[in-house]
Amino acid sequence: MSEHETAGEGRFNSIEIRVLGSLIEKQATSPESYPLTLNALVLACNQKTSREPVMNLTQGQVGQALRALEGQGMTRLQMGSRADRWEHRVDKALELVPAQLVLMGLMFLRGPQTLNELLTRSNRLHDFDDTEQIQHQLERLISRDLALHLPRQAGQREDRYTHALGDPAEIEAILAARQQEGGARTSGGSVSEDRIEALEARIAALEARLAELEG
């Protein structure tokens, strides 16, 4: 079995997903400090902005995730005289072009998103001309079982997309929550997009807490 096949079949917990997303983001936005030290990566994982949900991970949790990911070919440690640093290997392990890597990173950090959200949030990371370019790359990821298309529920204006590398139970929880939200809007009126995102963040936070307890 090739490295690509092994990595592609892997499933990662919420902490590992946050670690990968943070490394991908900082490679693009802070190239002068990338690869990252463990301390810098912990700060990146726990950012209050551009993270859904906001997490409060320890160095031990991030270090454990890095070692697990290293064993799957998704991260690599660079030994240094002053400090050891970590880099991701997502693009190489999954054979992704730069545009696909950016989209996976955004979905790792913020979960299900619309095409317009991905376009807006990618402006510091990659130069997409429009949502059609994003949709084309997402369709390629979906064809390889790396991403999922989530049809809009009742009361929603747009479809959403998310990565498919998390725990299957977490993905099912997201889908179930969306179905429940859609039913609530049909019977009880409209619910704001902010409310939807808040519910998604609460679900993800509970899943992250469960992953911490199990770890």
Swiss-Prot record:
Return the InterPro entries for the record. Answer: DUF480, WH-like_DNA-bd_sf, WH_DNA-bd_sf
Which residue ranges traverse the bilayer? Answer: none
Listed HAMAP family: UPF0502
Family affiliation:
Belongs to the UPF0502 family.
- Name-wise, this protein is UPF0502 protein PP_2442
* Native organism taxonomy: Bacteria, Pseudomonadati, Pseudomonadota, Gammaproteobacteria, Pseudomonadales
